[in-house]
Design a protein with these regions (language model features):
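Sec-dependent N-terminal signal peptides
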Residues: 4-13
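N-terminal catalytic scaffold of extracellular/periplasmic and nuclease hydrolases
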Residues: 18-164
Length: 164
């Protein structure tokens, strides 16, 4: 099972009107395919504790795609990144075949710095759901082109072979 870590960095350079307790960055970490069973297994092997318990905010996401009760990473990632359901295998496109805007793109439009980090290919479905609009998660080279044309400030991940 691949676990994907996605980080969204949003430095808030708003100025003096900013409250002192406003965070400088927001980091969203997604354990792709990770559920309660995987968390429990981690707890059982580590004296019934995980570092997740130390995080100030954690959450779970229960999703299903438009066409299936069992979602895939593309549809789940699109739902998380864009706030709208789509079909399995589809990234950043809704049921009306319209391109969706992700939270990362909205932050870019508002002057925030953004980044993605993946411990798998950076063009895999979950990280790609934050920048790609394409009808198949398997079109890796086209997804790589969309990443290279994006305004993402920083990205790290595998998948060099897809950037021709």
């Amino acid at each position: 099972m691949n676990k994907i870590l996605i980080s969204l960095f949003f430095p808030l350079a708003i100025g003096h009107a900013q409250q002192a307790d406003t965070p400088l960055n927001v980091i969203l970490m997604i354990g792709d395919g990770m559920g309660l069973s995987q968390i429990s297994a981690g707890m059982y092997t580590n004296n019934n504790q995980t570092v997740l318990e130390d995080f100030p905010v954690i959450g779970l996401s229960k999703t299903h795609s438009i066409n299936n009760l069992v979602t895939d990473s593309a549809a789940a990632g699109t739902a998380m990144a864009c706030g709208e359901k789509t079909y399995n295998y589809v990234l950043g496109i809704n049921s009306d075949n319209k391109k969706l805007e992700s939270v990362l793109e909205i932050c870019e439009e508002n002057g925030y710095n953004t980044g993605l980090i993946a411990n798998s290919s950076i063009v895999h479905a979950t990280p790609a759901s934050f920048y790609a609009n394409i009808d198949s998660r398997k079109k890796y080279e086209e997804i790589a082109v969309q990443l290279s044309e994006s305004n993402i400030d920083y990205f790290i991940g595998g998948g060099k072979k897809h950037f021709n």
